Amino acid sequence: MLSVAGLDQLPPVGPPEVALAGRSNVGKSSLINALLGRGDAARTSNTPGRTQQLNYFSLDGGRLWLVDMPGYGYAKAPKEQVEAWTRLVFAYLRGRPTLRLVCLLIDARHGAKANDLEVMDLLAKAAVPFLPVLTKADLVGPTDLRRRLDEIEKRLARQAAALPGPMATSAKKGAGLDAFRARLAAYALPEGENRP
């Protein structure tokens, strides 16, 4: 729908927004494509750090906007550019009145890494509600997946801004997508409400 490189390019305040954050190559673009039912809405890449802007996608007939944020933890770009992306992301998180939730995507194969935990702390300090969502759940066995979810749940108990009930998804196999869509739908404008 729209790509934003600076705060002055943000769209006018409209429907509620849910942002997707996560380490580079965690599968944000693949998850967006699966949610939208399109393979080409968000560009996927094996190169970490490909997303360098805030990318807006319309979901549920325009009743909710998804915002794909630049990945953290890796970026093959000059330091000044990485710092500019970081400023954009944090300014967006602090100041966007329609931002309702940040879905913090975590690779199910590895669980929460140090930089994921730092982002959880940052979101808690900014009082931005967040929901951890494991990606690539099809690549781990059920026992390991349950253990990862339990580890995250324990950590969430210490985070005031965290929503209970971390989720597990697989963009490739479709596992968990219906439950995730239902969770997102709770933030959408009611059916028939005026949209900008």
Descriptions of predicted regions:
Residues 1-76, 186-195:
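Conserved G1/Walker A P-loop phosphate-binding module
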Residues 14-15, 35, 79-82, 117-121, ...:
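Short, glycine/charged-enriched secondary-structure capping and boundary segments
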Residues 31, 102-103, 180:
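Hydrophobic packing within well-folded, soluble alpha/beta domains
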Residues 87-164:
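Conserved C-terminal guanine-recognition region of P-loop GTPase G domains, centered on the G4
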Residues 1-7, 139-196:
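Canonical P-loop GTPase G-domain recognition
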Residues 57, 135, 180:
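Residue-level signal for inorganic ion chemistry
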Residues 9-13, 48-55, 64, 70-100, ...:
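Switch II of P-loop NTPase G domains
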